[in-house]
Amino acid sequence: MTVLPDSLPLQSRGPSSATLAAKLWRRSRKLAASTFALALATLYTAIRAAHAYRVATFNLPPNPTNPSPNPNHLPLNPAKAATSRPALEPPAPLEPPPTPPHPPRLRILHLSDTHFYRGREDLVGWLQWLASRAGQDYDFVAVTGDMLSSFYGDRYLAQAALRPFAQTGMPGAFVLGSHDFYENRPGNPLSYLRRTPSRGAHKAVLDPSFGRYLRAFLADSGWADLNNARTSMQVNGVLLELSGVCDPHIRRDRYVGFGPDFGPVPAGPGTATQSVVAPQSAPKPDGVIRLGLSHAPYSRVLNRFAADGADLVLCGHTHGGQVCLPGGRALVSNCDLPPSLASGVFLWPPVGAGADVALVEDVAGVGVEGSCGGVPGRGPWGVSRMFVAVSPGLGTSYFTPLRVFCPPQAYILGLS
């Protein structure tokens, strides 16, 4: 009979539980440190990306009435034209866009969503440089709101950034966004994952003193105030009819159509509206360009512009999704448009079976929010299609100062 020893030799024993625990602890610490370092590097890269300002140029062909090969999203000759970095490096010189088959009659600089707060001084310098290109690269300035995020940005940054444009004598127009009326406040980021109807601002968060410096500057700038108003002007020998609405996202919009000077039509903060209270638009004369401005690209507002023969509507608000998948594929739009339309230039109304944008509105009456399938041919009501440019904006929220696969951009749009 074999007798087993009371204990195994020391060299034949496995590692003790204490030794295993120590090894696991060391490995978990290394993994945690590596993960933390990677997260910091990613965050740093995303924050720097939010300061890499660019200009994108689009040349829009005339008469966009026929369906395009990609009718719901049409990036037309985009060209990265200028880039800057946070370290005060001089911007790269503008690269000329591809020569269009129809030379543009009018070039529009579109600025949106600067969201000025302390820490965006580099954007002020970049915009001052861009102002020096007035007359060389663009003939008209359009501002579509959300220029502010804080009292500091209102008092010290917004005027410093925009005044050089006005001092050139460049004609322009503007509408306001919700954050030109009240400061950014933290919110639930998951709420952006759903398509949202206009929500109406709570009056308790509106401060009459917020934005007063920006509004005072704009009032003295000589630019057209298109907040629920319309006007017309000659720019480079082109008769330009302008119409705009105050921010539909907080239901301040009152659509006024195109035609002789009218407005502004007042709208109280958070007042519910479906955007139609104005006189009927005048018939569109030959050779006239009709330009619409709205901070948020809600479908009911786009439908109104399309019904009145707009050639181009400029919007912001979406930040292009701000945090996107590779290739700039947005996850959210923060309005009732699909994420695929969160930035860029596209034709409206959409056509084809894949069009999932809200298009349920009675032209003669009140707009209705909702969604439906595609619409045929030239869009609802037999109207011609128009271009819509949704800017990804130049800034970010104070609470999420980063961008992922979504560079901050200003647009220059050439209209033939």
Each predicted region: which residue ranges?
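Active-site neighborhood of phospho(di)ester-bond hydrolases with catalytic His/Asp-centered motifs
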Residues: H110-S112, F140-D146, P171-S178, L226-N228, ...
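Intrinsically disordered, low-complexity domain-flanking/linker segments in eukaryotic proteins
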Residues: S68-P101, P189-P197, A201, A267-S281, ...
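Beta-strand-turn-beta hairpins that frame and shape the catalytic cleft
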Residues: P62-P67, N77, R85-L88, L94-L109, ...
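Conserved beta-sheet core of the metallophosphoesterase superfamily
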Residues: P297-Y411
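N-terminal active-site segment of His-dependent metallophosphoesterases
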Residues: P9-G14, T19-K23, K30-A160
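Solvent-exposed loop/turn segments at secondary-structure junctions
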Residues: F116, M147-S150, S178-Y182, M233, ...
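Binuclear metal-dependent hydrolase catalytic cores centered on His/Asp/Glu-rich metal-binding motifs
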Residues: R194-W223, V235-S294, S299-N303, T400-R403
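Core catalytic region of metal-dependent phosphoesterases/phosphodiesterases
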Residues: P62, Y117-Q234
